[in-house]
């Protein structure tokens, strides 16, 4: 476990806080807490990547939509010409520029599913003694699907959700964590609430509440069995209670004038 660079870390110092998890695991929710209203949105035009300068720290990506962070990085790649920088590469470059300056938050589903690119970033940051904090969210499938369904219902979509699509993205996140632990990277793995608490500890320079979870490996055998159950379900649907409470209500303001004689 590469703790040497992490032990003396103070929030605001150079460093990367990378939060990983599947759709609906709460990655963006955690990061949004650390984007103050006065944050200045900036952009690396050469790599097509936006980030927030929050004074003491940076946040990579955009957060105007639910799917933000690194998933909102567009890069400069033109599929018609095959030229430019792909979104994943652009995110890596942005992290490489920002994290050695001051604490940088980065999260995204796609970035979280790969180990090779993350290890490359880790090794590159290590050259400048920049610590890489790898936070991986462990969420029960039911909570993940409930979270995604709620988000969809709030946006006006009450259609059934494919269980296969999300389960497919979940396993690579855990597989990359498994490789990271084996490679000796600093990792911590726990439920969303636990990860949120530990990130807050780091931000406020407190000892980590759940330091015993550092280096914890995922149980991929158990995960595969649970994933198969959800694969077999095919789809899940929002409850009627969820729809009644959260589905956007139609508005009638401004219609009265049409009916006046």
Swiss-Prot record:
Keywords tagged on the record: Host-virus interaction, Inhibition of host innate immune response by virus, Restriction-modification system evasion by virus, Viral immunoevasion
Signal sequence range: none
Source superkingdom: Viruses
Catalytic activity: 5-hydroxymethyl-dUMP in DNA + ATP = 5-phosphomethyl-dUMP in DNA + ADP + H(+)
An annotated GO BP: symbiont-mediated evasion of host restriction-modification system
Function as written in the Swiss-Prot or TrEMBL entry: Phosphorylates 5-hydroxymethyluracil (5hmdU) into 5-phosphomethyl-2'-deoxyuridine (5- PmdU) on DNA as a step in the pathway leading to thymidine hypermodifications in the viral genome. As a final result of the pathway of hypermodification, 5-Nalpha-putrescinylthymidine (Nalpha-PutT) substitutes for about 50% of thymidines in the viral DNA. These modifications probably prevent degradation of viral genome by the host restriction-modification antiviral defense system.
Family under the similarity heading: Belongs to the thymidylate kinase family. 5-hmdU DNA kinase subfamily.
Protein name: 5-hmdU DNA kinase
